[in-house]
Amino acid sequence: MTRPTTQIFDAAATARLMPYAALVDALRRASIDYAQQRIVSPERLVVPLNAGGIMLSMPATAPDLAIHKLVNVCASNGARHLPTIHGQVMAFDADTGETLFVLDGPTVTGRRTAAMSMLGIAAFAARTPREFLLIGTGTQALNHLEAIGELFPDALVWVKGSAPARAEAFCAEQSGKVRELRPLAEAGATIPASIEVVITLTTSKQPVYDEPARAERLVIGVGAFTPQMVEIGATTIGGSALFVDDEAGAKHEAGDFIQAGVDWARVGGIAAVLGKAQPVLGGPVVFKSVGCAAWDLAACRVARDALARG
């Protein structure tokens, strides 16, 4: 019997298969599925590559779909003028094990990560936000800007970079993705009080945001993914209710919380809020996402459904 050729999608085609609104809905479902053990997503396997690079193996299975993300992270690629991350996400039939399609790994990761932040806004923001601050000017900042542009088209987005020139360049290059895009162009500039959502998107090893906690401002940490990294300082964390996307992974990867010495008994999972098992009482919130393969499975569900519609 002749088997059909497996479809392989590049970065642009992968992005077209997963609009942010659909990703947020899929992540809402997957968060609850994962918490209720309807998705199996073991801790990622990490093996070394040359020059400090790493290979990450991240499988996940559900009754309707199985996926495996394999990505390589090579920090030394900048000197080679190559992307830091390469990889693929493969989707499989959960009954037969046959390969269904292959997606671009960095694109899946970037888009589902931004969509998880948008789900965090839906779960924890006091009201529909109109003003955002993105701290960081890399790929994840771009993914988040695109997500905000799709889901909050009337928003004003501020950008803070590691240097004022970086924020200015980012805003100039990405003009038009949201209604209004402004750099925080002065070093040490005061963060406007009107900002309702702050999203940190760096690989910093010292806090890039440590303001007193405010009930009307949601803080979302994305970039720090090892115990050595920290973006959100102890002042903000100490005054906030704390939530994560993946409770198991966060204990090993959420550097912000680890370095602040948080009591993990007071850290909740987003699934409990989405499932109404744990109410949010209206005070300040920090939501930290670390990611897991269950979220890649959610993205593959979106792609599968898009392909089925043709």
Stretches found by the model and what they are:
Residues 151-174:
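NAD(P)-binding Rossmann-fold cofactor-contacting core
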Residues 141-142:
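N-terminal Rossmann-fold NAD(P) dinucleotide-binding loop
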Residues 124-131, 153, 215:
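Short helix-loop-beta connector
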Residues 1-109, 118, 125-128, 294-297, ...:
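N-terminal ligand-binding/catalytic initiation module
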Residues 228-310:
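Adenosine-phosphate binding glycine-rich loop
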Residues 148:
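Aromatic pocket-lining residues of Rossmann-like dinucleotide-binding sites
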Residues 137-138:
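Glycine-rich Rossmann-fold phosphate-binding loop(s) that bind the pyrophosphate
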Residues 177-257:
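Rossmann-like adenosine-cofactor binding region
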